[in-house]
Amino acid sequence: MPERRTVALVTLGCARNEVDSEELAGRLAADGWDLVEDASDADVAVVNTCGFVEAAKKDSVDALLEANDLKDHGRTQAVVAVGCMAERYGKDLAEALPEADGVLGFDDYADISDRLQTILNGGIHASHTPRDRRKLLPISPAERQDTAVALPGHAQEAPAPAPEDLPEGVAPVSGPRAPLRRRLGTSPVASVKLASGCDRRCSFCAIPSFRGSFISRRPSDVLQETRWLAEQGVKEVMLVSENNTSYGKDLGDIRLLETLLPELADVDGIERIRVSYLQPAEMRPGLIDVLTSTPKVAPYFDLSFQHSAPGVLRAMRRFGDTDRFLELLDTIRSKAPQAGARSNFIVGFPGETEADLAELERFLTGARLDAIGVFGYSDEEGTEAVGYENKLDADTIAERLAHISQLAEELTSQRAEERVGETLQVLVESVESEEDGEVAIGRAAHQAPETDGQVVFTTREGLVPGLMVEAKAVGTEGVDLVAEHHELAEVAR
């Protein structure tokens, strides 16, 4: 009988990375590895890193060092870096961080089991030389579907294992660009990749250089994966990619998302479909209509504004201004008054003036966003903005970050207060123990996992994870809502 091999996956970063980890888990489980939750119980600890901004990279390095410490006591024998930071820096990361026994890029994912076994046996797998992955795909989007470039979340052209040959809980390969997958956890919410990469050239962003150009997954693969997730008990699916508004452009139909969403909403067992990562400049009336009027599709708009001062946006290689962005939000709310809206912003961008900051404040005050993320600008090697003049000093960036973050906290708390009295459809996600008993936690249509607020129920009576219930918002705790389960609210009347 083969010796038991155990592996733990530690995931940092965004929902796209979570999907990649579940792909790696599926590949490893299909090849006989036992997945464990705690890295201290694993022969190999695989850290799925994030390479987005400096703080995320630091967190990734810290996680690798923490995993390395486990080798001094307990079962752990090897630590391996995967993910965006590993792909972005390759052998440079391996040289800078000898504590990692291996640094694997996206091209290694299809052979992840063999790679880990080699490392576990004391062998060495040479790390890749970093390269610009945008150059691996044709310039024309229409020519990208037939390429054989490794794309996390998209299986390659390979013979599909028979379902009976796969361990329980592993999704079978459904064809080209639909990966093996094994769920890591029991949450009633799961992400599904619509696409990989990005064709935009924002001057501050390095993501396209290591995630590559934009390429869509085929609708049939997205549907099959969603059906499988429903069979696993998932109630809400969140569609993720670097830019969901571009979905279908390489498949000959830029409006493919408008067609796909109703089909996903019709999958048996799925209670909610949520779309994330939308570009304001690419929003179109038909997409807004589908997002605001399709049953089971959340009227939720994760819009990547980044700033609202025209001069700053131009320097970012982006489009828009305060008034056009406010008009977009007005259009959305005219169709769905309770629609959720969130965004992220960068402050302290090179050349940003006090007037630009005031313009951003004007937008934030008028936008009534449910959730706001604020980041201070930092240079990312390989981006256009690194060479910009008129850079702000670190103290000024820190001051502006603190100021806008405080404003964002106040505004999102006010927005939560505006929602008191609303009737909400809430997906119960967990029941947690507190000093005075158990409390049920969920999220309404305007609240995405991890990044946004949540709903705290006044009682957990009759509530279990995975249940979709109607509730009335009766109070707030910062950006979170306090709500009564609808049946209890009726009794109270």
Curated annotation (Swiss-Prot):
Cofactors (names): [4Fe-4S] cluster
Residue stretches making up the Radical SAM core domain: 184-415
Record's subcellular location: Cytoplasm
Transmembrane portions of the chain: none
Amino acids binding [4Fe-4S] cluster 1: 14, 50, 84
GO molecular-function terms, A-Z: 4 iron, 4 sulfur cluster binding; aspartic acid methylthiotransferase activity; metal ion binding; protein methylthiotransferase activity
The EC number(s) this enzyme carries: 2.8.4.4
Name this protein carries in UniProt: Ribosomal protein uS12 methylthiotransferase RimO
Record organism: Streptomyces griseus subsp. griseus (strain JCM 4626 / CBS 651.72 / NBRC 13350 / KCC S-0626 / ISP 5235)
Gene: rimO
